[in-house]
Every structure is written in C-alpha cells, then in structure tokens.
Amino acid sequence: MKLPLLRPLWPMLSPAAGSPDSPPEPSKPSLPAAWLLLHALFCATSMAVGFRFSRLIVYLLFLPTPINPTAHLVSLVSPPVMLAAANATTTITTTTTTTTTTVTTTTVAAEVGAHPQHHHHGPVFVGRHPIRVRPWPHPDPNELLKAHHILAAVQNAQRSSRRRGAGPPRPVIAVTPTTTSALQVPSLTSMAHTLRLVDGPLTWIVVEPEHHTDAVAAVLSRSNLNFLHITGPDSSTSRLRMHALREIRKRKMDGVVVFADENSILRTELFDEAQKVKSVGAVPVGVLGEDEGTSETFLQAPSCDAEGKLVGYHVSEETMLPANRGDMLLSSRLEWAGFVVNAQALWEGGGAASRPEWVSDIDAIDDGAAASPLSLVTDAARVEPLASCGQAALAWSHRSDALHEVKFPHEWKIDPPLVTIASRQQDAKPETPLKRTTLLNTEGQH
C-alpha cells in the first residue's frame, strides 16, 4: 500500500528496464487525489472498528465473570430490549448451594401490561459487585420502612460524629429555673421541643420555688424526656439556679451543664459546642434587652487574641471588658445562657474528677454575686472560649419582666369548654363568650 516507497524500485522491477548507464526516463505523474481520499477513509474506518473490538476484548478480559456470560455480552453490545407482550409472564429461579443445604427460590413476576417496560439482560454491576434489580425495593412495606429508619439513624449518627468528634457524646444536664408567669407554660413547652433534638442522653432539671405546680408537671410529663422536678427555698431565679447546681453536686451527676432559662432560645449547635468544655466555657449569645423603658440589642461573646486565648468579654455593642477585671465583670449583667459547665467541676471530695482551684465553691457564693455566671470562677481569664471564639450567636436571651404581671388562664385552658354538652338545653345562653370577653378586656388593659 505504501506505493511512494516502492517508486525507486520500479525501474529495476520493470521487464523493459535497460542498463544502469541508460539515460533516465521522464518522471511519472503523481497518484490521483481521489485515490488518496479513499485511502484515508479506509484507514479511519479500520481505526474505529479496531478500537471498538479492542474495548470489548478489554471488558471481557478484566471484568469479573458474570453469572450468565452470554447475557452479559449482549448487555454490553446492545441496548435493553423493549418487551411489549400483552400477557407475558416471567419466572426467575435462583439456586443457592452451600456445604450443608441447597435453597431454591422461584419468583414469578407480575404480568406485563399493555405499556412497554424496560428489561435488562443479565445482572447490573455497581463497581465489581452485581446487584439485583427489583420493580420494588422490598415486597414487604414494613421491612422497607424499617430499612429507612435504619438509614436515617445511621445518617444522624454520622452527622453527629462529624460535629463533635469520633467519641460518644457526654450526657447533657439542662438547668431551668421557673416561676409562675404568663410565659411559663409556653416557654417550657418550647424548651422541651428543643431539648428533644439533642443527640445523646439528657437530663432536664426544672426548679420551682417552694412547691410543685400542676402546670409544670404536665409539661414535663408530655416532654418524653428524662427530667428531675425539684423545688427551691426562694423565688429568686438566681437562687433557684444555684440550688440546681447543688443538686448536681449532691447526686454527682456527670455530663455538661447547659443553662436553659425560660427566656432563652437555644440552637442545637450549642449542645455540640458544650461537648468540648473541660471546666467552664463561654459561647456567643444574643441579648434582646428592655430595661427601664429602653430597648437594646447586642451580642454577648468572649473576645480572643490571635492565638485563640480569652482576653475579655463583649458585654454590649461597644463595650469590651478585659478578663482580668473581675469586679467589673461581676457587676455587669451577663446571661447564663452564654456559659456551659462541666458537672465534674462542681464535685467535692478530691481526686481527678473534683473541683479545680479556680472554680468557686457553690456554697461560698453570696446572693448578690449569684446573678452573674462568672461567680462560678475566681479567675475569669481561665474560662474557655468555645465555638472557635466566633461571633455567631448560639443562643438568644430576652430581657423583659413586663409579662410577669399579665393575667392569664390557669394552665392556658378554657373552663368551661367551648363545646356545649348535650344535657344542656339548646336555648340556654352559653357562659363561655362572657369569659372570653373578660380575657380580652384584661389583655387590653395591659
């Protein structure tokens, strides 16, 4: 085919070739352009066909041996076949043989409808492993639902492990001091739904003044949480909170303590950051303030240097107090929702799991200092900044005492009910609209 290379040999191969001393003949004309185009077309065709067959040979040599080689070869070469038989049935028989038993399973597929369906020849491979294609993932819907629950549980565990690390989560102890007010039942109900989203074991400690109330007990019973309902000697929120911390020390409860006050809104990321605390830690918290008729909104957060060490606290929009000024920090109004504590740091009795020297004794904290979360430490600079010392709020606290004086229905229930019982006469005037009008007038006064 390489005719130009043979051109120098033509005079020697020709029968009429003369002696070497004879004069050279005039050069012959070049090959026509049509012949060159035909030659290029044949070369391209041979390359395409060769690549196709070489690819098929590679598949046959290096892929694992399928169950049905003939069907596997057909599936590689040709697309799936459309079967449109009106009354066709398919029977699939699978035989599994082991050293002791032989199990034969026969599955009869449903009749193919009038509409065509796709059928694959041979098994479908995912990587190097064949899988079985079913028209439905599992014939039993109950088993399918269980499989979805298992997948959801595995995915939640993987997301939680990526957030907090590979180790199991420590127990969470949520402390909530509560007093009777219009916000008590709504706030506790909202907090219960938030705590139910926490990964890992959780104990909810709710402290009431003097005695238990039915409204709080009803919220706790509906929460489906592990709770501890106790009472304190005083109605002050700070004293009730300290009473809960003494109860943790008395019972030697292990875990991380999160302060979930009634006026707080917590994010689930707060509980993930609380897992990192060693003794006492601080997180950013947004504050919505209403003090003496003025409204102020700012972010309370720890302030860090370039190395990530605590240097102060942001206590307002434009004020940052240094960490070494404990007197100024104690006098400032810091929110308990922005601090987390390791429960073992409250224990007494010595040992590795005992209170550090820079953590205050709960019994030695007076009532005036109990309102500040920094009363738990003797050195405010030893507090651990969490959340990478970021400026994104992990909780919000609403400072407002106006709703504590608002009148509200007992347990937020309408008594008598709106539905009239059958024993009453139809022409009798219901008393419920009158009570509803009274409630509206009461709300209008405030």
UniProtKB/Swiss-Prot annotation:
Q: Which residues are glycosylated?
A: N87
Q: Which domain of life is it from?
A: Eukaryota
Q: Describe its function.
A: Involved in the synthesis of glucuronoxylan hemicellulose in secondary cell walls.
Indicate yes or no for the key word Glycoprotein.
Answer: yes
Q: Where is this region: Disordered?
A: 425-446
Instruction: From the UniProt record, give one GO term of the biological process aspect.
Output: cell wall organization
Identify one Gene Ontology CC term for this UniProt entry. Answer: Golgi membrane
Give the bilayer topology.
Single-pass type II membrane protein
This protein is called what?
Answer: Probable glucuronosyltransferase Os04g0650300
Q: What class of enzyme is it?
A: transferase
Chief location of this protein? Golgi
Q: Which residues cross the membrane?
A: 31-51
A GO molecular function term, named singly, is: galactosylgalactosylxylosylprotein 3-beta-glucuronosyltransferase activity
